[in-house]
Amino acid sequence: LGVNHYYARLSQNFINSITALTAEGKLYEVDMRLRPSGTAGPLAVSIESFNDYQKGQAWTWEHMALTRGRVISGPDTLRIKIETIIHNILSHPGRAHDNLLHEVAKMRVKLAENFGTDNIWSMKNIRGGIIDIEFICQYTLLANGDKYPSILKRNTLRQLKEIKKAKILSADDV
């Protein structure tokens, strides 16, 4: 059994175990279409493949998701490698800001069309709600992470605090 095949099988077994329907329901919902290359891509890739994909082929939404990425287990050497890759991707200086803003705005419109609401109790999807706050943070991180690495936090509240401290947005806007 080759390394790639082994890790693909291990990943599938892990996914099956956390998504299995039990008497209490499912532990987690996992949408494996949301991975590099979608359903055509492998379930598990090498660190080098992950890095190459993120540098050259990843979509804006994938980098937005990466702003929340974190290593939850594994040896310190592996954690450091992955965190370094994530940091380097998020702080890449060659990002086209106009295109980035357009892509983020387009995604937000698409989400609003599919999940938007006028219900004031829907704190997540209402205009000005949690999703808008997260999109503002994610855009700000991708647009400014090269100049202000201190803003590259995983937690939205910490991101907002660092964005305010760096004076990227005014205190009133934050």
Q: PLM ranges: what are they?
A:
Residues 1-174:
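A nucleotide- and high-energy phosphate-metabolite-utilizing enzyme signature
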